[in-house]
Amino acid sequence: MSDAYTAAWKASIDDPQGFWLDAAKALDWAVAPEAGWTEADGWFPGGQLNPCHNTVDRHVAAGRGDAAALIYDSPVTGTIATFSYSELLEEVGRVAAMLASLGVSKGDRVVIYMPMVPQTVFAMLACARLGAIHSVVFGGFAPHELAKRIDDATPKVLLTTSCGIEGSKVIPYKPMVDEALRLARHAVDHVVLFQREQVTAELAAPRDLDWMELREKTAADAIPACVPVASDDPLYILYTSGTTGTPKGVVRDNGGHATALAWSMANIYGIGAGDVFWAASDVGWVVGHSYIVYAPLLVGATTVLFEGKPVGTPDPGTFWRTIDRHGVKAFFTAPTAIRAVRKEDPDAKFLSEIGTGQCQAIFLAGERADPDTIGWLEDKSGLPVIDHWWQTELGWPAIASCVALGDLRRERGSAGF
């Protein structure tokens, strides 16, 4: 083990209160916390902050407004777009103004049923800005599954798009939203729909509103200020898959979650301001919440939002092409994705031709990573492949090698050890 890793481990064991209070200094707090953790009050009691301020506003205020915040890479539409932190602030602020005009405020719930498009990220951060609680539902979930989540979260507003794109298949969302709302006992006040060029959805007034028309209608409204929330106030509700029964809503806090994410970016993934991080997941899952949206932006990094598949969009070289094109420093994906790439390109011809650019490590999670898959990826890429473990209920890695602390220990088939 490295000296840096040993020192960090010892500090966390000898003085956990001090260790996590020190980690919390990576954030801007409206009111500083009184302690790191107490059994009665949880993480950072007394502390108040706003996650949108910490992911967006503070970087602009620090003079990094021109730095790239979000890269949208969509091979299914042939679109690549980059949003600076200043542009992200404007987009998030406009969505926050839209939601505020519909009466959304601190503590209200907003269901987001959207695919991998920038507007999904804008919506999540806009909710956080207002102190509202977002509940992102994986785009394309069947109406009865969406209805269950609507009934549990009881949202004031539902945000959606006219369609999602899965590989070469365009999936209209509005019919599924309409059916879900018909099945649900809870009635939302409004549905706000972003029209994509692939499908134009019909809207039913007065419930349904066009995203861009509402944006134009509220264009003169001031961007709402970031609302401070208590450390243990909810940031979001994310439902487990429901494979073992009724989906269970995991309620994520603000202060502890943000502190853990910022610490993990710096110490597990080795990512800081100006670096490019790519988690090849979906915002409908916990990896997307934590490591597409919140964690990279908390540390001022650039995050990649990828609307595509490991293979077929257009070929098994799409991962390596995206890594090389955007200068990705650390890449996070699931073992299943690598197995799909290997099946289509067993000799890694695309990887050999394209390379891995500036990438320094590949991280795997989401399921068991079999030693054979890890070995193939390490041998073909020449990069350390870090298998680490966590789950929806945790929100960040519980078992991992801390790459930035010089801890590259790994045994194939054993996550984080």
Predicted regions mapped to residue ranges:
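Conserved helix-loop-beta element of the AMP-binding
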Residues: 154-158, 175-191, 275-277, 304, ...
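ANL superfamily adenylate-forming
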Residues: 77, 157-231, 344-347
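Conserved AMP-binding/adenylate-forming core of the ANL superfamily
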Residues: 52-53, 70-125, 142-147, 207-213, ...
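ATP-dependent adenylate-forming carboxylate-activation enzymes
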Residues: 114-115, 135-151, 163-172, 282, ...
